Amino acid sequence: INDLNHIKEPSVFELHHNEDTSIVIHRGDDAVKKMILGALTLHTGERFSILQSSNKNDGWSRVFGVGNIMKLNKALRDKKIIGESFIPEDYFEQLIPYFGKKWAESYVDRMNIIYLLPPQFFPSHAEMLVFKDKAILFHVDGEITVERKKKEILLMIKTLFEYLKTTAKKVDPQEFLKKSLVC
């Protein structure tokens, strides 16, 4: 991947031996945006898990814009896509001043199960999305996503998320938002 750092224009590289072992690398704002939006909105009626940091300076607002993030949350709700969000305990406290209350309301309005984790589970701004058929490791601010489809890798990552469920505190999204707005 370091060999790709000099590339600034949007690009997609696919490295694969067969369908089960493909790796797709997306570089640049447009490629990252297209890949993440496609992955999140093409799985109607499915469930995904996301490990999501509370870094307010990340590329989400730069690449997508707050309005488009709210539209994405609405699309997830309308397509009945269920998100299992693993987020830091201070998620809303960090992001509401930056993205606004309406953004937070759109976040909890979608079909969402929230698991809170201590901040030390988020040492970087990299994030991870997992669907039944692929895992996506991404760093929006770094303008890169890596998509993995190997079954053994997916099983390992899904097992990690199952473990996180036993460690995390499951909260009601609406109650969590109300509590965060009071702070």
Residue ranges of model-derived segments:
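Signature of lipid phosphatidyltransferase scaffolds
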Residues: S22-V24, V146-C183
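Residues that form generic nucleotide/phosphate-binding pockets
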Residues: D3, I7, M35-L42, A75, ...
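Short charge-dense sequence patches
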Residues: H16-V24, A104-I114, C183
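Residue-level signal for secondary-structure boundary elements
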Residues: E9-V12, T44-R47, K169-P173
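Short, charged amphipathic alpha-helical surface segments
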Residues: I1-S22
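Intrinsic structural disorder
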Residues: I1-I7, K80, F86, K179-C183
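Hydrophobic protein-protein interaction segments
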Residues: D29-I153
